[in-house]
Amino acid sequence: MATVNQLVRKPRKRKVAKSDVPALQACPQRRGVCTRVYTTTPKKPNSALRKVCRVRLTNGFEVTSYIGGEGHNLQEHSVVLIRGGRVKDLPGVRYHTVRGSLDTSGVQNRKQGRSKYGTKRPKK
């Protein structure tokens, strides 16, 4: 425990919270251009081909972003919107592409949880 005199001489330091999504620079989303679209495999014990893309953001950052949902239309030079949110079994993937905005299409034939995948309400 510090004495009053010690605290007068040198006050307590505030802890600085480190951002989980530094490339967004305190913005909710960022726009970017796909530089590479590919699949990668997750860490043990999971097994799959996860769809990801490398994105050059408008602020100059280059990040890896996960493409959620079944099927996508992204290719090189597609303009995408990026939000925060990591993928636990893919090391280095700390961002998600927003489905249904800019060049990213929504997921086809999706009935539940549509808002998360940019899918319009189906006709009766």
Swiss-Prot record:
Domain of life, source organism: Bacteria
GO biological process: translation
Lineage, top ranks: Bacteria, Pseudomonadati, Pseudomonadota, Gammaproteobacteria, Oceanospirillales
Protein keywords: Methylation, Ribonucleoprotein, Ribosomal protein, RNA-binding, rRNA-binding, tRNA-binding
Region described as Disordered: spans on this chain: 1-22, 99-124
Biased composition annotated in UniProt, kind: Basic residues: 111-124
Function comment: With S4 and S5 plays an important role in translational accuracy. Interacts with and stabilizes bases of the 16S rRNA that are involved in tRNA selection in the A site and with the mRNA backbone. Located at the interface of the 30S and 50S subunits, it traverses the body of the 30S subunit contacting proteins on the other side and probably holding the rRNA structure together. The combined cluster of proteins S8, S12 and S17 appears to hold together the shoulder and platform of the 30S subunit.
The UniProt record lists the keyword rRNA-binding: yes
Assembly behavior: Part of the 30S ribosomal subunit. Contacts proteins S8 and S17. May interact with IF1 in the 30S initiation complex.
SUPFAM superfamilies, per the entry: Nucleic acid-binding proteins (SSF50249)
Name recorded for this polypeptide: Small ribosomal subunit protein uS12
Organism per entry: Marinomonas sp. (strain MWYL1)
GO molecular function, one term: rRNA binding
InterPro entries found in the cross-reference section: NA-bd_OB-fold (IPR012340), Ribosomal_uS12 (IPR006032), Ribosomal_uS12_bac (IPR005679)
Family: Belongs to the universal ribosomal protein uS12 family.
